[in-house]
């Protein structure tokens, strides 16, 4: 049996081909899985569970089919969809996980996280994250009208794009690569904090398997891939794990 782990789909009405790939994945490759974990950024934007979205409706229905069939579904919010709440979770049939958290995968304790917590060189983003994850901010934000929330999300996205464009112009993208990737010291600190030998995260869109030494322990960090030019899924079973790519339709 296999556990399937994905992240960074960034589902958006403007990229319907990715939505179709994900729905096909759910139809054809999920039946019989031990569990499915979605580690954030399932959606490109989420401004509250009352947000009208045909894409979100189709995804919820497809996920619910597997939940009703007995497959455990888990969702960890990302930086794009951290406002996914209990109402949508109930519709889709998944359990919302804290970021980070430790799960047992076939006898191997594994720390799961979206991954943005490890990108501490991006000081501007970490400040924005701290502000927008504050419970008081969230409660106040969700009382605003849909149009006001959408305007805030659009402004935040434009600011993010401008920030990243500025980084790319410095030192031939060297600064961009550094700031948007994880900080090794933070990775080591998280391994030390949780006392596990395996970590799985997304966010950076740099799929790979990394091996490192932490306090004389050999640890593995698995980085999930995004769903832009292809799909990406991590398959984990009792024998190990493998990162697989899914081809876009057409």
Curated annotation (Swiss-Prot):
Any one Gene Ontology cellular component term annotated for this protein: extrinsic component of plasma membrane
UniProt: substrate binding residues: 79-80, 122, 160, 172, 175, 203
Cell compartment(s), UniProt: Cell inner membrane
Record-level Gene Ontology MF annotations: manganese ion binding; UDP-2,3-diacylglucosamine hydrolase activity
Bilayer topology term: Peripheral membrane protein
Record keyword Lipid metabolism present: yes
Protein residues bound to Mn(2+) 1: 8, 10, 41, 205
EC number: 3.6.1.54
InterPro entries, sorted: Calcineurin-like_PHP_ApaH (IPR004843), LpxH-like (IPR043461), Metallo-depent_PP-like (IPR029052), UDP-diacylglucosamine_Hdrlase (IPR010138)
Cofactor(s) this protein cannot do without: Mn(2+)
Top-rank taxon: Bacteria
NCBIfam families: lipid_A_lpxH, PRK05340.1
Family listed: Belongs to the LpxH family.
Protein name (database record): UDP-2,3-diacylglucosamine hydrolase
Name of the gene this protein is made from: lpxH
